Amino acid sequence: MNRQAWTVYGRFQLDRGFRIPDPAQIHWGAPGDAGPGTSVLGAIGGKRLLDLGSGGGHYAAHLARERHAVVDAIDVAPTQHQRALLQYADVPGVRFLLGDAIDHLNRCEPYDLVYSVHGLGYLHPHRSLPALYRGLRPGGRLIFSVLHTDLHRRPPSSSLEPRQLKVQLKGLEPQDVHLWVLAPQLWEDVLTDHDFTVEAIDLLHRHEDDPVIDQLIQARRA
């Protein structure tokens, strides 16, 4: 379901020839919103990073060009992968991968840092977190954003269950997706259960006419 939604979105953007503007920083909530930006990643020059759910590849290319990181960017949707290659294939220091992030993490050389802008919320934590532990070096960092309130203004869940939502992707009919929209304490508990230390959970408010609130979570592998 999730793969299909983002494949449809990627095809729509390819068909209309849309190119993502090169970002000046990472937007962990909605594009263009104020927030901590790229600074939360720290010093990443020469470090190996994984962008999980990389979409059109703009953040991976930005970190490779401007912060001199070595970035693998993985997405499960073939049309999103195609968009990234069309726009950023010639950027040194970034490699675009098509496939399942969990499979990749279970067989890759460990990374220094894994980050995800609204990608991890589409994966069951009991599947993704063991793979992330395997795919990070000891002491490696995991930084990701997820929804705190959903698109219907409902608060986060206190139980580890996904929600079936209709996501409005610009220019398309609403797409069905499964999302884990969890309370901060539940995220901390499940991360701790998988041997991550949570260093910060921040709530990010979007612009005033957007009721959605995001979480930015920073954790470290044991």
What is each model feature region?
Residues H178-D195:
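Short alpha-helix
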Residues R127-P138:
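A short glycine-rich, Lys/Arg-flanked "PGG" loop and its adjoining helix->strand segment in the class I
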Residues L113-H126:
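A short SAM/SAH-binding and catalytic strip from SAM-dependent methyltransferases
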Residues M1-G45, H58, R141-K170:
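Conserved class I S-adenosyl-L-methionine
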